[in-house]
Design a protein with these regions (language model features):
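Glycine-rich loop at the start of a catalytic domain that most often binds anionic cofactors/ligands
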Residues: 43-44
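Structured surface interface patches that mediate subunit assembly and partner/cofactor docking
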Residues: 1-5, 10-16, 20-33, 50-189
């Protein structure tokens, strides 16, 4: 399955949330343990830049700097530029078969890299929205697709990428199920 369209949708919803960040909110804590909103936004910028760079880099771990995203005077604009670069890099169909190193996780075809980015975007979009207190409403089918992929990952937690699964009732939204599966409390405030 080509996850690029789902990733584009997730990025649009996340960009809408990011566009609402005010400078005075950058020091707020987020649902991501150890990260302020500034740190989380820097992570998103770093990931977008690094995923884009990985499409043309080699597979050696030193080929891409996964922490290269810096926020200047306008962090929202920095995010928008990095996101646009990511989308452009993953536009060609040929990128889906290209082997690329994704941070410490290993070497994957671009089709898997897009899927990883998609999940990261959906979850971190929720993190940003919760932090600044604005609605976050990605399509339920988009969230269900992300959850389906996540359920393939081991549930043995915590790991460097995911915290212990949070138990939620069966009748919560697909988004709440997803964020709970990656270790976030859907009721975080």
């Amino acid at each position: 399955m080509d996850f690029r369209e789902l990733d584009r949708q997730a990025m649009k919803v996340t960009a809408d949330v990011v566009s609402q960040i005010r400078p005075d909110q950058l020091r707020l804590p987020t649902p991501c343990a150890d990260w302020t909103l500034h740190g989380l936004l820097r992570h998103l910028v770093s990931e977008d830049l690094a995923f884009a760079a990985a499409t043309t880099a080699g597979t050696d771990p030193s080929d891409v700097d996964w922490n290269a995203g810096w926020l200047g005077a306008d962090p929202v604009a920095d995010y928008q530029r990095a996101a646009a670069g990511y989308l452009a890099a993953f536009e060609p169909d040929s990128v889906l078969d290209r082997q690329m190193r994704i941070n410490v996780f290993g070497v994957f075809p671009g089709s898997v890299a897009v899927t990883m980015h998609f999940i990261d975007t959906v979850v971190h979009g929720w993190d940003v929205a919760k932090t600044i207190g604005v609605p976050y409403a990605p399509d339920e089918q988009l969230c269900a697709a992300a959850l389906k992929v996540m359920r393939r990952f081991p549930s043995d937690r915590p790991t460097p990428a995911f915290d212990v699964i949070v138990e939620v009732p069966d009748d919560v939204s697909e988004l709440d199920k997803l964020v709970a599966f990656v270790g976030r409390d859907p009721a975080w405030a």
